[in-house]
Regions:
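Bacterial N-terminal signal peptides that target proteins for export
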Residues: 1-8
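C-terminal motif of bacterial Sec signal peptides marking the signal peptidase cleavage site
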Residues: 17-19
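Loop/helix patches that line or flank the sugar-binding groove of alpha-linked glycan CAZymes
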Residues: 58, 268, 276, 286-302, ...
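C-terminal beta-strand-rich structural cap/linker in extracellular carbohydrate-active enzymes
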Residues: 585-602
């Protein structure tokens, strides 16, 4: 969500256009109960999952991001659900992944695909019940798979019991759980929101003649982290899920939670700079250190700082072990590579982005390695080549890259098959609220809607949210009903059933890549060194840990390339991984289009 999501919406809109009180009381009662359940005895072992997690386990895992709405439908309503995921756990186990990151499944009116939460201790009805969740978690742990959940606490839904009470009266005990500006003080200080048609992050609320703050949509009022009672509510929610046995949290939009409640002027806010202005507010790290003391230090959880910091140095503050905050960062720099050039980017840009972050994180802290997510286009369409001749080799190359870099790899559902952008041509096919609102704005401003549609075909978030392609059965085996979002028509040839039977498929290459990383720890912990930096087609680097050394050579082009081995490097044997059937060792490597090699070195 957050930075990459904000980036996309800004790009779409700017680049192409000229009973409440009682409910709240019930919530508070539930909070007190969960706090009692999460006492020291329940957390003494520091590991409630039963997996015997060692410290730092999250460095060696491979994370599979699973978008529940699009993975597997179990009841024919066209929406993926928890029972559907449970039915596919053996498939997830077969991949070799160690951790699933699940996008939000909490109670929600679903204004923003679950990132607007109305009940942090319930399951969204579209996805099932808490019993379904318990069965899913048990099934994952039985197969040695850990579960990480999104923690979305920069804001709640406006349908949360806290907000319903807060907006009903200025004297509500939940009033200070949110940010308010009384109308009698005049217009509130300017705050920018891409998600508002007027680009205003303040929404007037008539019942109490006040404005409330929403960095995201008006359906997502910002929570007031200056209030210690609100912070304790969040910590109790975290204990509730940790005591259930989940294995980690991805801290969604957390870089925005700290705000100066006096709202000093922020002159000159624009679409290009407002997210940086909101980052790293006062007391942000005080909150994280408090969270660590109160909750995280009592469990062996994987904690991920989404969008942490405006640069690698700032991000390090979140994950420096000496600071006792979070485990790893998840940056968005790669999202901006070639973002305004449809179908094009420069390899040098990717090298520079990953090199910059690697330099800062080489000896301390830890980072995530990823190229795709629910907020971005499919990686083979964005960074590879989705033409039929090159889809498979380029998808394999991108997998090789993710599994051979320094950091914890994140693989998005469907990328293991080489799923591609769907390239909708009609606005009626889109479900993404950002795309639909953007189209309406272009239309209202009499802009070029045809150009906007072409842009969406490349960059809409719906490209990465199409249903998983299980087989050549109707709707790709995803549902017996009408899918909530159209299935990519290439499912007849790009699907799990076909690829499992093909030893040279993208899917089986993905399995081999994970097995390679698990076998050779130099690919987890080894030092990264870039080679031939100026080469516009080849990305080559070594990974070194003591006497162990590996060479990774990636041809990011649709043409054959020749690459001479640098002086002092000698291949020690057969490739650990190769996305083509043959390899000829020698002083110069002959590389096929989109060929990817991982080679042991002497």
């Amino acid at each position: 969500m957050t930075n990459c999501r904000l980036w996309l919406v800004s790009l779409l809109l700017a680049g192409l256009t000229a009973a409440c009180g009682q409910n709240a009381k019930t919530e508070a009662t539930a909070t007190s109960g969960s706090q009692a359940a999460a006492g020291p005895a329940a957390r003494a072992a520091g590991d409630t999952s039963g997996l015997g997690k060692k410290p730092g386990w999250w460095k060696e895992t491979v994370v599979y991001q699973l978008y529940p709405r699009s993975f597997q439908d179990s009841n024919g309503d066209g929406i993926g659900d928890l029972k559907g995921i449970t039915s596919r756990l053996d498939y997830l186990k077969s991949l070799g992944i160690g951790t699933v990151w699940l996008n939000p499944i909490y109670g929600s009116p679903n204004d923003d695909n679950g990132y607007d939460i109305s009940d942090y201790r319930a399951i969204m009805t579209d996805f099932g019940t808490m019993a379904d969740f318990d069965e899913l978690l048990q099934g994952m742990h039985a197969r040695g798979i850990k579960l990480v959940m999104d923690l979305v606490v920069n804001h709640s839904s406006d349908e949360h019991a806290w907000f319903k009470s807060a907006r009903a009266s200025r004297t509500s005990p939940y009033r200070d759980y949110y940010y308010w500006w009384p109308a009698e003080k005049g217009t509130p200080p300017a705050r920018y929101s891409t998600f508002d048609v007027k680009k205003n992050a303040w929404q007037y609320d008539a019942p109490t003649k006040s404005y409330y703050l929403h960095y995201f949509s008006k359906k997502q009022p910002d929570l007031n982290w200056n209030n210690p009672k609100l912070r304790q509510e969040v910590y109790n929610i975290m204990r509730f899920w940790a005591d259930k046995g989940i294995d980690g949290f991805r801290m969604d939009a957390f870089q925005f939670v700290a705000k100066d409640p006096t709202f000093p002027p922020m002159p000159g806010l624009t679409e290009s700079n407002y997210t940086n202005a909101y980052n790293h507010g006062p007391h942000l790290h005080d909150y994280l250190q408090e969270m660590n003391r109160e909750v995280l230090s009592h469990y062996r959880l994987m904690t991920v700082a989404e969008g942490a910091g405006r640069n690698p140095q700032e991000a390090m503050l979140f994950v420096d072990p000496a600071r006792h905050e979070l485990n790893m960062t998840y940056h968005f720099d790669a999202v901006g590579v070639g973002d305004k050039r449809q179908g094009g980017y420069k390899l040098s840009e990717l090298k520079n982005v990953f090199g910059k972050w690697e330099q800062e994180f080489a000896t301390k802290g830890w980072q995530s390695i990823y190229l795709g997510s629910h907020d971005q286009p499919r990686i083979v369409s964005r960074f590879g080549d989705d033409r039929p001749a090159f889809r498979a080799p380029s998808a394999k190359l991108l997998t090789t890259f993710l599994l051979s870099m320094h950091g914890t790899p994140y693989c998005y559902y469907g990328d293991e098959l080489g799923m591609t952008n769907i390239n909708f041509t009609s606005m009626a096919d889109y479900r993404d609220v950002a795309a639909r609102n953007g189209y309406q704005l272009v239309k209202d401003q009499k802009g070029d809607t045809a150009t906007y549609l072409k842009f969406l075909a490349h960059f809409s978030r719906d490209n990465s949210r199409t249903p998983f392609q299980w087989s050549s059965a109707p709707n790709a085996g995803f549902t017996t009903g009408t899918p909530w979002l159209k299935v990519n028509p290439n499912y007849l040839t790009v699907n799990e059933a076909v690829e499992t039977k093909d030893s040279n498929s993208v899917l089986n290459h993905f399995r081999r890549a994970i097995a390679m990383r698990q076998q050779h720890k130099v690919l987890v912990y080894g030092q990264y060194e870039l080679l031939d930096k100026a080469n516009p087609h080849i990305w080559a680097y070594t990974r070194t840990q003591g006497a162990d050394k590996a060479l990774v050579v990636l041809n990011f082009s649709a043409t054959p390339q020749r690459w001479p081995l640098p002086t002092g490097l000698a291949v020690a044997g057969e490739p650990w991984l190769n996305n083509y059937p043959t390899f000829a060792a020698g002083p110069t490597l002959g590389l096929q289009p989109w060929q990817a090699l991982v080679l042991p070195l002497k």
